[in-house]
């Protein structure tokens, strides 16, 4: 028994030292520091943000912007895939309209929002969105929701956006 204990102890140490923590998922923008303190307060400030827009000069879903209700102030920032700020505004209702993109392009960008409601509460959001001049094969078209799909109940219905499929 006295000889087995050191063997078990050494084997356990070797096995534990061989284990490594799995890497954390990579997020290109830092969402730390965003504050949301509206939960459970009955505050009716809302921010709706699509996950796609189509700057293709067809007059539909050309601008990427948050749609707000009962929001008094906002800081809205957009980052490219290299974490470079490409747009920022503090004007409610204002959004990003990039120069016309080439056809058959699907690009991913990131946003960060810190807003103050009319009741002086905070809402912080961050995430990714897609600039589309065509629909990629994956994910399916149903993955994307555009500003024209927004109703008083959130994003419902079908977009009027008619884009070709990217190949």
Where are these regions (language model features)?
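Sec-dependent signal peptide recognition
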Residues: 2-10
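Short loop/turn motifs at secondary-structure boundaries
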Residues: 22-167
């Amino acid at each position: 028994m006295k000889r087995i204990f050191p063997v078990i102890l050494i084997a356990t140490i070797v096995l534990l030292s061989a284990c490594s923590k799995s890497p954390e998922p990579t997020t290109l923008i830092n969402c730390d520091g965003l504050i949301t303190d509206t939960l459970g307060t009955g505050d009716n400030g809302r921010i709706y943000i699509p996950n796609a827009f189509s700057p293709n000069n067809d007059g539909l879903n050309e601008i990427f912007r948050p749609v707000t209700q009962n929001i008094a102030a906002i800081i809205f920032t957009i980052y490219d895939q290299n974490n470079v700020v490409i747009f920022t505004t503090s004007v409610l209702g204002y959004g990003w309209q990039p120069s016309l993109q080439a056809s058959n392009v699907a690009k991913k960008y990131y946003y960060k929002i810190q807003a103050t409601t009319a009741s002086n509460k905070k809402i912080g959001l961050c995430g990714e969105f897609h600039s589309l001049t065509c629909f990629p094969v994956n994910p399916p078209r149903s993955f994307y929701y555009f500003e024209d799909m927004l109703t008083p109940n959130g994003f419902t219905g079908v977009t009027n956006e008619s884009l070709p499929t990217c190949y």
